[in-house]
A protein has these predicted regions:
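Substrate/ligand-engaging "lid" and interaction regions
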Residues: 1-42, 46-536
Length: 536
């Protein structure tokens, strides 16, 4: 059985293997979409394929849509050549359930895959053709937060962005320049309206995307590449809207165990590949079942019936509240605590950590106990139910191959939101954050993790982080097993408002974190002993 249009003709084989196939005519959907695309998506990776592609598939199955999604890859063009084209743009979606069973379905909703290459006329002209079509209703994005960044920490444009500014729309290279150039084509054609929707997992994502597109447009205006009217078009939300959204579905890299099961079931050529850009991707995508997408309902040219596929459509304030609930209380703070302690305690699977008595207690304390008193309640979702599902269904799912090492990536960029916001809320409500124990313990655990030595005294490789070098320098001289080597090195980190959003000493917990950290560097087994002490 091959995952191709030809291969799907053997319906009985797929059904016998327990793999559901689309009931709609995949070729017809592709033809409809090609003629008049309604939805274009930038960032053709895993969460897009299973979640967003799955939404479109649901609408097609229900007869609520007759078009799919046009996929555009902006970063790793190998994905198009190795994962889309050889498989006729089909995806095998595998939902991993906590009881060990899986739901498997082929999605036929991704109708075309294009590379965002302005230097390849065939690709570039096709994108222009799509963008000038008035039928286009929305473009969406999962390109990660980094994909929107135009400037480095020094406030200067990245060199590749400066090159895009200098070279103009016809030679766009970065995702933001490509999108801005294509929006300019739409403006020049007939100024048709459009919704530009970030679906990346970062707060105020619509605002980030809007700022980046507008910055690029204004830089081009200053150089004479675009008209003043183009900037006005982008600035008018009745013409071009930038709705905010909140997305949530844990989508780990393709698991070997899933690949083996599919091969045993008779599916051929399904193994993951590693692209030249180091993307680990396969013809199948595996993910958890629970999923949430909340979008600000601001679509000036109409939209697909997303609510029929389980998407929450609401106002901006509610989107913001849902996002804040998730990232500051109900999911992300728990994940980060498990990530840093998991690495130090030698875990390689997040789910296994939930069987660890102290770590289980830690996440119960961080979310339901310490987070809930100051949680943001969005109204459309219950924070208590959400965190209950996270702790009892989502994180303990043993078939989710998610690792503490993956989640520990870029922690310096996350602790301000994941812990700093709750700490600030405690200061606002109680005058200080001294009531907190589990959150300071999580922060102490991150500092201990930064030493790159596990609880048995062995070195381990820390995950990538833009501040890793700076943080390593700040902690210089500290030796595990020699508490006397600590001379206040944590102070510059814990007082750094750029990291935590607040000076933790002013919040009343800086010294407490230092003391916990000191206990954790006492020697082999000290991290476990410290967790036992505070999470008894």
């Amino acid at each position: 059985m091959k995952l191709t249009l030809e291969g799907l003709k053997n319906k009985q084989d797929w059904e016998a293997a327990g793999i559901a196939l689309p009931s709609y005519d995949i070729k017809k959907v592709a033809e409809n979409t090609k003629k008049a695309p309604a939805w274009v998506h930038f960032g053709a990776g895993n969460i897009f394929r299973i979640f967003i592609g799955g939404l479109a598939d649901t609408l097609l199955e229900k007869g609520e849509a007759d078009k799919g999604i046009t996929c555009v890859e902006t970063f790793d063009f190998d994905v198009v050549d190795k994962i889309y084209k050889p498989y006729d743009n089909l995806v095998l979606a595998v939902t991993l359930k906590a009881d060990g069973s899986t739901d498997k379905k082929v999605l036929g909703s991704l109708t075309e895959a294009i590379k965002a290459q302005s230097n390849v006329p065939e690709e570039w002209n096709r994108l222009k053709e799509i963008f000038v079509n008035p039928a286009l209703q929305m473009i969406s994005f999962t390109i990660t937060e980094k994909g929107y960044a135009l400037k480095g920490a020094d406030g200067a444009f990245f060199p590749f962005i400066q090159a895009d500014i200098d070279n103009g729309p016809e030679k766009a290279g970065s995702a933001m320049a490509v999108v801005c150039a294509l929006l300019n084509e739409r403006y020049k054609a007939e100024k048709a309206p459009l919704a530009v929707v970030s679906m990346d997992n970062c707060s105020h994502n619509g605002e980030k995307l809007q700022n980046s597109i507008l910055t690029m447009a204004k830089e081009w205006l200053a150089k004479g590449f675009v008209e003043e009217g183009f900037v006005e078009y982008l600035s008018d939300e009745k013409q071009v809207s930038f709705p905010w959204s909140m997305i949530d579905k844990i989508t780990p890299r393709p698991a070997d165990s899933v690949c083996e099961d599919l091969e045993k079931a008779g599916v051929e050529d399904i193994a993951p590949v590693i692209t030249s850009k180091r993307t680990y991707i396969a013809p199948f995508v595996n993910a958890e079942g629970p999923q949430y997408l909340v979008i600000e309902d601001k679509f000036p040219n109409g939209r697909p019936a997303l609510e029929k596929a389980g998407v929450y459509l609401t106002d901006r304030d509610t989107v913001n509240k849902v996002e804040r609930m998730k990232v500051t209380t109900c999911l992300n703070p728990l994940h980060t605590a498990l990530a840093v302690y998991g690495c130090v305690l030698g875990y390689t699977l997040i789910a296994d950590e939930m069987k660890d008595e102290q770590l289980n207690k830690l996440v119960h304390q961080i979310g339901p106990v310490e987070g809930m008193p100051v949680v943001t309640d969005p109204g459309i979702l219950s924070p208590a139910d959400f965190v209950d599902e996270v702790i009892n269904v989502r994180i303990p799912n043993p078939f989710m191959p998610d690792t503490p090492q993956r989640i520990a990536t870029d922690t310096s960029q996350k602790v301000g939101i994941r812990y700093g916001e709750t700490i600030k809320s405690y200061v606002a409500q109680y005058g200080d954050a001294k009531k907190l124990t589990a959150i300071p313990l999580a922060i102490a655990g991150w500092c201990r993790y930064l030493l790159g030595v596990d609880d048995e005294g062995n070195a381990f490789e820390r995950s990538a982080d833009p501040m890793l070098e700076e943080l390593t320098k700040a902690l210089a001289g500290i030796e595990v097993g020699n508490p006397a080597s600590y001379n206040g090195q944590l102070k510059s980190i814990l007082s750094n408002v750029n990291i935590f959003g607040i000076d933790l000493y002013e919040a009343g917990i800086g010294e407490r974190i230092e003391n916990m950290f000191l206990e954790e560097i006492a020697g082999p087994g000290a991290v476990r002993a410290t967790l036992k002490k505070y999470m008894a």
